Amino acid sequence: MKLLLLAALLTAGAAAHSISPRAVWQFRNMIKCTIPGSDPLKDYNNYGCYCGLGGWGTPVDDLDRCCQTHDHCYSQAKKLESCKFLIDNPYTNTYSYSCSGSEITCSAKNNKCEDFICNCDREAAICFSKVPYNKEYKNLDTGKFC
């Protein structure tokens, strides 16, 4: 019985740490709100040292710093008392927001954790819209340059 319980907990933990397509889609749509016509999943994944999964080293430019700040924001979310481990992981939790023009508003209906994560994504999307995109940092050899 203990082995069955352990297996169930490990499976739940592994599932909670996988990235939810819906959560990624929300962040993508926020970026599209601030940068209409962009292709966020193509453009910003594997950019510099921090944009995409993981991140380490020194950011290569301002856009990469936006991603580093976003990563740190997610790390802070995981430490919040209102964000319950397994349930409110920033990579899996979804939230409510609206986009009007290029303005993003996180919904008052969000709980504290959802609001924090929403604002992490909102601030990153705004940051992306204010800095240049340097094609030479797309698919950067992170082992060499980070």
Curated annotation (Swiss-Prot):
InterPro entries the record matches: PLipase_A2, PLipase_A2_Asp_AS, PLipase_A2_dom, PLipase_A2_dom_sf, PLipase_A2_His_AS
Annotated catalytic residues: 70, 121
Main subcellular location of this protein, as a coarse class: secreted
Pfam name, any one: Phospholip_A2_1
Subcellular location: Secreted
Annotated propeptide span(s): 16-22
Broadest EC class assigned to this enzyme: hydrolase
Catalytic activity: a 1,2-diacyl-sn-glycero-3-phosphocholine + H2O = a 1-acyl-sn-glycero-3-phosphocholine + a fatty acid + H(+); 1,2-ditetradecanoyl-sn-glycero-3-phosphocholine + H2O = 1-tetradecanoyl-sn-glycero-3-phosphocholine + tetradecanoate + H(+); 1,2-dihexadecanoyl-sn-glycero-3-phosphocholine + H2O = 1-hexadecanoyl-sn-glycero-3-phosphocholine + hexadecanoate + H(+); 1-hexadecanoyl-2-(9Z-octadecenoyl)-sn-glycero-3-phosphocholine + H2O = 1-hexadecanoyl-sn-glycero-3-phosphocholine + (9Z)-octadecenoate + H(+)
Cofactor-binding details, from the entry: Binds 1 Ca(2+) ion per subunit.
Cofactor dependence: Ca(2+)
Tissues/organs with expression: Expressed in pancreas, liver, lung and spleen. Expressed in EPCAM-positive intestinal epithelial cell (at protein level).
Cysteine pairings via disulfide bonds: 33-99, 49-146, 51-67, 66-127, 73-120, 83-113, 106-118
Post-translational modification: Activated by trypsin cleavage in the duodenum. Can also be activated by thrombin or autocatalytically.
Subunit annotation: Monomer or homodimer. Interacts with PLA2R1; this interaction mediates intracellular signaling as well as clearance of extracellular PLA2G1B via endocytotic pathway.
Family (UniProt): Belongs to the phospholipase A2 family.
PANTHER family: PHOSPHOLIPASE A2, PHOSPHOLIPASE A2 FAMILY MEMBER
Name of the molecule in the record: Phospholipase A2
Source organism of this protein record: Mus musculus (Mouse)
Lineage: Eukaryota, Metazoa, Chordata, Craniata, Vertebrata
Gene field: Pla2g1b
